[in-house]
Amino acid sequence: MLSQYDEQLAAGDNNGFNKQGNATLYSFDFVDADDFLDSISGALPNNGHNNVNPNTNDISFEDMNIMNPNIYSPVSAASGDDFTQSSGQPMISEGSNYTGQNFTDYLSDNSLEGYDKNTSRPLHEVDIGFSNKRSNSTSTGSLSHNEEITPISHYSVDSIVTSPEPPINKQGDFPPIKRTTTVSSTNSITNTTKKPAKVTKPKSKDKNSHNMIEKKYRTNINTKILALRDAVPALRIAAGCDDVSIADLEGLTPASKLNKASVLTKATEYIKHLESKNFILKQQNIELHRLIQHANMNPKSLPPPPQQMQAPPQPGFGFYPPQNQSFNVTPASQYPSPQQQVSPTQQQTVHHPPQPNRYLLGGMAAVMGTSLFGGSGENDFRSLSALPFSYLFPNAILNPSPLTIQLWTLTKVLLVVGSLASIFIPMYKQAQLKKEDKPNTIPETSLLDWILISIGFKTPAKLSVSKRDAIISNLQGGNDWSQLVSDYFYLAGCEINFENCFLSLVLGTIIRHRFPVVATILNHYLSMKEALLLNLDYKGFSKSLIRLNQLISKVDGVSIFESTNLTTRLTNVFTNNRINANIVDGQNHVKYIEFYQRNINDYYAIVFNWRLLEFIHELNVTYLEQLNDDQSQVLTDLKIIEAFFGEQDNKLFGYYQLFTSILNANYAPYLFESLKDKVESSLEKFRIAYEGIDLTDHEIHNTSSEDEYEQESPVVYKYEPTLKSQKSLISSLNLVNEEEFIILTCSLTIYYYKNKEYDRALKLLNYLRLDNDSKTLSLLTFTSLITLINELIPGKIEDNVNLDSAIRICRDWLENPDLTQYMDEDIKLELKKIVVTKGMIVNGIDVNESDEE
């Protein structure tokens, strides 16, 4: 049976969805879905109404530690009763409270990741991405945790506009989930408890084989520990080696014991010591390279070599510390820091040779300069006739002509200019040498440089990695507007590529948002940058920039810089304000905080994820606007952005799954499998974080170097508690929030209702015990509720208390102006009509079809 969404999908993509008319729906176990909804029903705030067990009447959960689902990264303080196994032995001592690190820290622990990849049991493999028919491209939709695959790594134009097919029961692709028989397992456990335990002595052969494996395992570990001990000087001294002395420790203390803990501790200490020593040597090497480059650039100004001084002894094996120096001194104190190292050019005073005749030339220039103002040049020749040898001078000098007088005046002027030049030119050269001696710094592009680059009189500069990091660091909480404006002009004068244009547009958009006065001037330059950005390809290796480049060039265009909410959030991050301050859009704001914290070291990933969340929000509003109309455009847009929701990003893909399950209830089984796997994996990691990793006989055997396998004793597996028995723990850790629970329940109910399994749909609907407070509902949650009442009313299960509560909550939500101020009045009016009409039907009031429409 196809829903209205399947028909729209078929209309939108004939090649991919026309074959679904005769296909059966994806089949999965209803008992699993029922048990899972029962175990996560604590996600709703009114837990007193949620503890409903349809199968048994003697089970109640009165002491559930319900956390607020709207709090990000909750810390559980569950009591020891929440961790009790069926055997009656609590995992945590009774009466104690868990006060360890946050549960999110447990999930990010390296040891847990290693365990999850190697030793934990595999999760259920469910094809989440769904098979698509694509031309010239191949795509796989299986749920994968491979960190190296990105949604753009196999990107093509065809693959980006394909849509996931609704989940159908294809033989081989979607095998039905096996039904778990909880009754038989319960009976077997009951029988074992009634009969007395029979103690049997194991066979000697099996016991000997097991002991041999353990012995080889211990021998292998001890051998590696001994090899590690011989590699650390502090341990070799404690072991009594003769080739190592106290001086070889380089300031480290020798070990007092040789147990395994001491070996690992001293080995870690020695590794850190070597890293510190390596860092200091690198700094010295960099300083020497700098001095060599400076000497090659200025060979004439190189000062004489400094006086030879005794070099400090280099640490190493055979090095004895100076007198009165403790061995506990860290090796870093034995080396001068880069700030303390003074280059020879700074130690030597620059001595310039004296400038003889400088004052003499200055006096001559002054005398000749004053003679220029003494009258005409004839006075300089009149005194020549008084000389006793005046008869030797020609008549042209004694009685000069006007031309001779002019030539003499010009000669005096040139002599004065030459004298002044001989004074000031050496002073200028000396000032230039002082500038060259200063360390070279990267000059920042000023406003004048930007103007020169704009008119083509200067070549653009290249954006260095350090400058780029400084710009991004200022964007993430710098709160320095003057630096932000300076960075904008700097980027405007840099070479043109995708990253520079994107950063320049981000800076310009934030400035325009903060200072609307300059918007008129900035819009011209920003429009030019936007036109360039659309035609630029990113050729680097940053995955976030690759995805941003594909998103802008294929889907979003320059609309990303026109988003007011995105610009406001980026401005809030820059000014160290709350991320969602001054924003009311009906979204789950916790999602934005989660993605910011997960990508705090990648600014481009933050912008990318936030923009995808806005895509879902915009499609959500469009879906509500066309709730009873043709929704093919919404599904087409959802197909376009599908490729960007990579499965390696579980958070982002999970949010995409929630919205997809609302649009098409046939995706509800995949959402159920995804949430169930997440809960089971989180519970397993939580158990491992508390109990530690248990090594089985098989793991012990695999770690040994034995090549031949011997007969082993059968492995006895530990009892794994069911999800039902861990209901309180699930709610305490907030593994499933209120939004996920409501959407999953609504989607599964619609799924069974459209499959004409009304009893099962009604049974799942009973878990939807909603709170009367509508202020905590996000837009996505409201969409799932209004879709539920729109699909089930009128129908065979319309007479239900939970449906009546959903109608009341939807009506209150629409009448709250604080929650719907971003919506058009026409959309709100149409939604109110739908809710009122459904409420009248539930209350038994006859409604004509024309009125209902």
From Swiss-Prot:
It comes from the Eukaryota. Disruption phenotype: Impairs expression of hypha-specific transcripts and leads to a medium-specific impairment in hyphal development. Residues 301-315 have a biased composition (Pro residues). Residues 165-209, 296-353 are annotated as: Disordered. GO terms for biological process: biological process involved in symbiotic interaction; cellular response to copper ion; cellular response to heat; cellular response to neutral pH; filamentous growth; filamentous growth of a population of unicellular organisms; filamentous growth of a population of unicellular organisms in response to biotic stimulus; filamentous growth of a population of unicellular organisms in response to chemical stimulus. Induction: Up-regulated during the yeast-to-hypha transition and in virulent strains during intestinal colonization. Also induced upon exposure to fluconazole. Expression is down-regulated by tetrandrine and by Escherichia coli biofilm secretory products. It holds the Pfam family HLH. Residues 180-194, 330-352 have a biased composition (Low complexity). Keywords: DNA-binding, Nucleus, Transcription, Transcription regulation. The keyword Kinase does not apply. Transmembrane segments: none annotated. GO terms for molecular function: DNA-binding transcription activator activity; DNA-binding transcription factor activity; double-stranded DNA binding; protein dimerization activity; RNA polymerase II cis-regulatory region sequence-specific DNA binding. Signal peptide: none annotated. GO terms for cellular component: chromatin; membrane; nucleus. SMART domains: HLH. Residues 205-274 form the bHLH domain. It is found in: Nucleus. Transcription factor that positively controls filamentous growth, virulence, and invasiveness. Binds directly to the two SRE-1-like elements upstream of TEC1 and thus positively regulates expression of this important hyphal growth regulator. Functions independently of known signaling cascades involving EFG1. Also regulates gene expression during intestinal colonization but is not involved in host cell adhesion. This is Transcription factor CPH2. It comes from Candida albicans (strain SC5314 / ATCC MYA-2876) (Yeast). The gene is CPH2.
